[in-house]
Design a protein with these regions (language model features):
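A structural boundary/capping signal
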Residues: 5-111
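Extracellular interaction modules
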Residues: 1-3
Length: 111
């Protein structure tokens, strides 16, 4: 079973922005790309870093580092220490515009 703690450890050097961006281009319907900040786990405990995932209804889809993590949003936010005020949300049409403009997968508006 894939554990969220393992995902958060790997994403510090992972492919989360690309994986989430690619997932958004494949999905149909109403989904949201999120660029946010998460708390590190394990070796990264005590550190916050940028991360990307996709939300659909009340589920987070985190396909970074070859994983296919799909968990309830409340659980993901609780374990990752995600705060809505730290996140940037992009509707279905926005990511492609940002990718073409910035020429990278993100983050685009986070410093």
């Amino acid at each position: 079973m894939i554990k969220l703690n393992n995902i958060l450890l790997e994403v510090a050097t992972g492919d989360c922005y690309q994986a989430a961006g690619r997932l958004m281009t494949k999905l149909r319907g109403d989904h949201t790309l999120v660029h946010g900040m998460v708390n590190g786990q394990g070796a990264l405990e005590g550190k916050r870093f940028g991360h990307a995932w996709v939300e659909t209804n009340d589920t987070v889809l985190d396909h970074s580092n070859g994983k296919k993590l799909e968990v309830p949003k409340d659980l993901y936010y609780a374990i990752g220490g995600c705060r809505k005020e730290d996140n940037k949300y992009y509707n279905t049409d926005e990511p492609l515009k940002w990718i073409l403009k910035a020429k990278h997968w993100g983050p685009w508006e986070m410093s």
